[in-house]
């Protein structure tokens, strides 16, 4: 695997750490590994990411709940804090926001226990993900929100290759244009595999495992 390098923005705490190579996810093969570990787990970076994302919802979106997938709970808490500050026009009648994450059962299906359902049912829900590429995880979360009676008001991510998911707008800080030659393929259509290039690592929302 090539050495990791950073793609920076004007904000020193908002960046992507990436490496080029041949990587496999559950749903696709890609030529980039995007590491957002520090953004998800370090407070200064999480706050910076949150500030970049919340301006999309500053004054025109009711948000009762932020549903976090891919381990984005710290960012979600920072977004909730920012959206309920006095300098924001908060359209939430209760002036507070729930921050939650799903429980996973067989096949990657998401569920919520009875004590958590009131945080979704009848609520305006923002979905927060580390990345939205194939969109399958985001779609599963949207299906779960709908099943439990919530209303999806948008999707936010650090990195996304799509601008909408199931008809909902996707707002991200980074997209494939920031990488230049980003590619993602279904496993059976991967040109690197067809060329005999070995997969270097398995990647998912938890990180990377070298092969």
Language model features by range: what are they?
Residues 55, 81, 85, 143, ...:
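Short, well-ordered alpha-helices that flank and scaffold nucleotide-derived cofactor binding pockets
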Residues 111-157:
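A contiguous pocket-lining binding segment that forms or flanks enzyme active sites
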């Amino acid at each position: 695997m090539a050495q990791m390098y950073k793609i920076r923005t004007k904000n020193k705490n908002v960046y992507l750490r990436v490496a080029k190579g041949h990587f496999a996810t559950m749903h696709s093969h890609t030529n980039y590994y995007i590491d957002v570990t520090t953004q998800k787990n370090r407070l200064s970076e999480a706050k910076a990411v949150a500030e970049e994302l919340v301006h999309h919802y500053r004054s025109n979106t009711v948000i009762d709940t932020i549903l976090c997938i891919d381990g984005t709970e710290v960012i979600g808490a920072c977004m909730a804090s920012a959206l309920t500050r006095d300098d924001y026009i908060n359209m939430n009648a209760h002036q507070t926001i729930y921050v939650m994450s799903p429980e996973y059962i067989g096949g990657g299906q998401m569920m919520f226990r009875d004590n958590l359902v009131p945080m979704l049912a009848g609520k305006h829900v923002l979905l927060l993900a580390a990345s939205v590429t194939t969109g399958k995880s985001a779609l599963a979360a949207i299906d779960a929100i709908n099943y439990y009676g919530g209303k999806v008001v948008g999707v936010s991510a650090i990195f996304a290759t799509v601008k909408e998911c199931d008809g909902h707008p996707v707002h991200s800080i980074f997209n494939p244009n920031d990488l230049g030659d980003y590619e993602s393929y279904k496993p059976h259509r991967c040109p690197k595999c067809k060329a005999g290039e070995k997969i270097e690592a398995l990647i998912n929302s938890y990180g990377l495992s070298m092969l």
